[in-house]
C-alpha cells in the first residue's frame, strides 16, 4: 500500500450528477483533493447511469442508487490503496452504502445520506 500513516477520506453532497459538466468538475476536484476514499451523497443517478460517474485512478466505485432520480450515494476507493473488499451493504431507499474491508487491518466505511424528515 502506498499510503503513509493516515487514511484521507473526503465527503461531499453533490446535489445531483446528471449533467456531464458537473461530473467532469467533480472528477477534477477529486483528483485535486487526492484522498484515498471519497464518499458522495445525493448523486441522483439511476442504476443504469452509474457508468457515467468515472474518475481516472479510481476503478473501485460502489453505488446505492434507485430507479428514481433522487438520493443515491457512492464510495470511491483510490487505486493507490489495496483495499480487500469483504462485504458491501446497500439499502433499498438509496440512503446508505457500507463497505467492510481490510487494508492492513479491518476497516468499515459507511456513506449515509439522511434527507430532511419531510423528504422521506
Tell where the protein language model's regions lie, with residue ranges.
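A shared catalytic/ligand-binding motif for oxyanion handling
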Residues: 1-120
Amino acid at each position: 500500500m502506498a499510503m503513509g500513516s493516515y487514511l484521507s477520506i473526503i465527503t461531499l453532497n453533490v446535489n445531483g450528477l446528471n449533467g456531464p459538466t458537473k461530473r467532469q468538475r467533480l472528477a477534477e476536484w477529486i483528483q485535486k483533493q487526492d484522498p484515498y476514499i471519497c464518499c458522495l451523497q445525493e448523486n441522483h443517478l439511476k442504476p443504469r447511469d452509474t457508468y457515467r460517474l468515472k474518475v481516472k485512478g479510481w476503478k473501485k466505485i460502489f453505488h446505492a442508487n434507485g430507479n428514481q432520480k433522487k438520493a443515491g450515494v457512492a464510495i470511491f476507493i483510490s487505486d493507490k490503496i489495496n483495499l480487500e473488499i469483504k462485504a458491501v451493504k446497500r439499502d433499498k431507499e438509496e440512503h446508505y452504502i457500507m463497505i467492510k474491508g481490510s487494508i492492513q487491518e479491518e476497516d468499515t466505511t459507511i456513506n449515509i445520506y439522511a434527507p430532511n424528515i419531510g423528504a422521506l
